[in-house]
């Protein structure tokens, strides 16, 4: 994790390209152990995709990403200024959603106004 000091941040236009752009952005800037890297990149991609699908917004609006080193791991936050998170939706085979975040992160949560979903991944692989 030594290619950045304590935090990274970026914004991506709310288009179908945003999840891929966020994955490439993080991979290019954070040297993470393989197991941690894969989990963090997949979780980030899913949350950015959720912003694209569910925020009710489109480009030129943006989704914001922040990554912070914390003792023993990483804290990642994805923010959009969309409609917020309501009741959970039924499982759909083509959408992993917050269930994926719940199973693959070590801790996670959300707040609305603006919509802010965060997760933490500990330094070792899960």
Describe each model-derived feature in a short phrase.
Residues 1-9, 52-126:
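Conserved beta-strand-loop-beta-strand hairpin that lines the nucleotide-binding pocket
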Residues 7-19:
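STAS-typified acidic loop motif
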Residues 19, 23, 120-122:
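Residue-level detection of beta-strand scaffold positions
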Residues 21-45:
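Conserved short strand/loop->alpha-helix "switch" segment adjacent to the catalytic nucleotide/phosphoryl-transfer site
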Residues 39-57:
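Histidine-centered phosphotransfer motif of kinases
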